[in-house]
């Protein structure tokens, strides 16, 4: 059947799952229209990396594939053949669907195994799923095969994302009423109170937003549904009404708005702002998060959790749920999200378990799904599941060190307590920079080596280039089973709707061996796609997913079958015997890329036979540690230039028993094995025999690559027990050698073209053909251009899709550091060009693959051209401003047109910790058995943002490290001034920017380890905040040093031949730094430098550039925000004596500052701690020279007295005020300072509707409380009247007409103009504040007297007087403008002013006022939303890690 065949033209769309930071995403691939009429081609690892598989070979493969499944009954086989023929027919309806291939099992012998051993179906086996969470209500995951026993026996969120702080205890009153952390009143019914077994009947309260407990897509669906149900109708009605009012006003007042009278103008403004308010809430609705009150108390059946999903406080109608480990309860929060709970630390922490993606449920379904139809069962349908969520929802489902360690700790605990975890499946991973060390890897080894858990991990979806295996399985020891992804013909038909079945193969994107240190990361391959169950929140029963994430659970399920059988036969096993069995019995696929399949395709039947046949083998309970050289590499890997000499290696081999520390000493003493060592290739040599007892032996291995042709070459040294050769090798030493092509040095343009037997120099590609070329990148090359074209005749506009993957390995860097992955469309009419960055002197792998499902044969002609321009002088890409002019010596690989450009795009601020505190973590889930307490070092940092900016935050010493890190966690959380969580980051946060509003922020960084002394060493670790500049800073180049000094003729472009050109860069001027508005304390600027004029080269050949600024200058500051002067080192200080809400300020640092009268909103933005306030009254900033005279003394004493007016109690303040006024009757500042004192002591509510609502509270009929309320109102009235009198004094003593005349001047030519301006500004600010204070007091008095309309004339007069000097939005006037809008009933204007105040400083009072505004307008749906926003925006404490 495979001899010759032809595929019909058709288009097909497939989906491939890629892993990005632990989160799976689907990428659609549209495949071309191509015909196939040639035999199949496959990779074989020769120089050209491609060979033809002959027709007999393909026939042999087909026959072997059929033989592997021939244990079924003949009748079944005939029926299957007939079904296959009918499916391939051009007409007719097929009544049977190939359901068995939806969750494939036949390929690996699982079906035959279960048919032979139906009782070995995974019973008595538990699989831990380290993933994004498992839905126990998904189809097939509810129960075991008996239909009764729960399948998902435990659910844990190990990430901390679902943690709720429940430390606060409250006791209900006699009616069961308590106050939740949301501020809502909650009522416990007598039934609930009776369940409470707490001795004091106390309950614990907490607050939780569930927004990060489910994927963003599902969160959007929830928001969309809620919006449709509760928002759209009232909001659309309100919007229409607001629009209608505007139309009516315009029809009644025709003409230009600017020509309207003043009262009509503000009315029009109000209507416009009402509509603007409605539109703004419509835009932000999707970002609003809902937080729920959580109540927790003990009962006779364990802890009971109540979540007030009603938001009304009626706990009888709220969600009730018990601990999952006791009750296995899962409850729906809404139509999408279901949760379970666990309780830790005696009730102090409530763990709410959700799911950060559907991935974990899909994985579990493959491993252990149990369905009514056995065709779609998982591999081990009767195995139990323990769900361990390691994907943190705060990080978009990426795994964290904290989650991994907690998950491993829980596995250890369960094994220790007799609830054994037999298998771990981990379809997660990243790429580590090195694998021979790291705390996470060490603990993984401990789980396997000490607790005997078989750990299965996905190899990764990062192929087809070599050295792309992820971590895990690439850790310090090869203790894990790594799995590659395979696709069978049956899967192609059933899962992908392909019109023809191609021969089985690995997926193009599955990661490839070797590990960077030479080890083997891929143990076996298995089916890597399935249409399996997904969580209910997807609103789908099943979905197609593919990737090594799907291959790993297939193997994990298969291991569960093996262990189930071994347990029932009472055969002792270990993770080592399991791994060796599946390795030596795997079906080697000779036509498949050997670097992708490991030992071959998993064969469950043969693996079980091997385990039972060799049950008495003395090596079943031990592993063989293989370490190469001093770095303890797992294998030998030569990829460092051209190999011209043989190399000798010392390889250390050590047998280690399972749980070595507790192993029987007699077993160690008696152990001896005599080994025969066999190298698979003649260019690898070693001794033939090794006698090995329980201890370390070393052998010498010589690798002689001198005779190897360019390409990749692999070999392996296998060690066989001479007493039992048939059980296969006990261990292997993998060897990989890469010999690169070296381009001729005399070439004008270095170009690589592959050798080809075709006349047109093309290479033939079939589906999944992989062509690898290894080229030594020439010196001075910085980028390469790949040119491709199809040479097949008569192709017309037909195109081919090629997966191009280039990779260069750099020391102590992951494979992702310098690589390019791209799917390129290639046609026959025009060349397709792909450019990418390269590193000179390093071997480049150019890997071109035809996608696995891409029908048709193509002949591809391609070439690789190297180009480059770079600076070669030391520290060329780092410039220090303090060193002046920076020099660049640039050279080109070939003749290039040079047009350098240097753009600095980010400003980097170093943040030093303000606090570092080491403390023990949870005593229940952060203690590694036995008794190894994990500690945290919690570092706190302050970040001030002067204006809204995009900011990235990272910890340099922990950045880009996870599995290889010495510490197990480096998570940080960014909080605003109200302790609301704004952003979260971890190992890879340096590339993620967050939009931050103006304000002050706190960053908390948690670093974890079990050794306190190590944590102490990082107490001074700093963070870096990277601010995106609003516009990049571009630096100029000069060809002449002197021209650079004077800023003369600039260098633009010129041709660069085979010579060196010197260019100079001048430091950035202070003026430009000031205009750039850099953040305070900026340490350096970062950006990119490009040299080539060629546009393609400019996109890819970018050199990271760092510009180090001069140290910050310390000097006096003025009110306002930092403008980035002094190399962005200077900052502004907030010098306000008053605050926006009238709170009593701190004492000023100097007497002179006491007379400062500033705007109510001052003090927001960037500030420097410990800087003294600045006197805005015009008093000198420093003492006068010489001895002080009597006038100086009097003035200083006056200023000191004024400073005490603000600080003292009101009675004392009045006395000091009287003294100041008596001595200095014209000193108007004293009046305003006394007003501030009165406001801070007696007037708490400053915003209009808040104040009004406080006065509307109905007084009691009689009694002591009524008298007290009347007395309080009397005090308020007295205070307001006093404010009016004090303000009147200032207003009467200030000549407003003179001020207006002065500010009407265009130019003041008087000699003392500056002094006059200072004095006039002082008078203006004093007058504005007095007018504002009086206006607010008058409005409040009118509210108390319920005669606001009678006071409108006076309020309007004060308002019009203020706006003669400043705009109503000005911070000096906005508080009174808010009251003026209230007096007129202009709620739209009120909204606008409150939003302006929020931009300056976000407080709960502002949100309360917004809610009241919408309540007054009748917008109850908006009021409800604002109340929700307040709960989330103003938490009582920082969120838990």
Curated annotation (Swiss-Prot):
* Means of activity regulation: Inhibited by phenylmethanesulfonyl fluoride (PMSF) and butabindide, but not by peptidase inhibitor pepstatin, EDTA, nor bestatin.
Give the reactions, separated by semicolons, that this protein catalyses: Release of an N-terminal tripeptide from a polypeptide
An example Gene Ontology CC term for this record: protein-containing complex
Give all residue intervals belonging to the Peptidase S8 domain.
Answer: 107-608
* Modification type Phosphoserine: residues: 1182
Kindly report, in one word, the top-level EC class recorded for this enzyme: hydrolase
Which PROSITE patterns does this chain map to?
A: SUBTILASE, SUBTILASE_HIS, SUBTILASE_SER
Alphabetical list of CDD domains matching this protein: Peptidases_S8_Tripeptidyl_Aminopeptidase_II
Stretches of Low complexity bias are at 1139-1155
Q: What else is known?
A: The limitation of proteolytic products to tripeptides is achieved by tailoring the size of the substrate-binding cleft: the two negatively charged residues Glu-399 and Glu-430 that are blocking position P4 limit the number of residues that can be accommodated in the binding cleft and thus create a molecular ruler. At the same time, they orient substrates so that the tripeptides are removed exclusively from the N-terminus.
What's this protein's function? Answer: Component of the proteolytic cascade acting downstream of the 26S proteasome in the ubiquitin-proteasome pathway. Efficiently cleaves Ala-Ala-Ala-polypeptide and Pro-Pro-Ala-polypeptide, Val-Leu-Lys-polypeptide only at high concentration. Does not cleave Ala-Phe-Pro-polypeptide nor Pro-Leu-Gly-polypeptide.
Q: What is this protein called?
A: Tripeptidyl-peptidase 2
Instruction: Give the species.
Output: Drosophila melanogaster (Fruit fly)
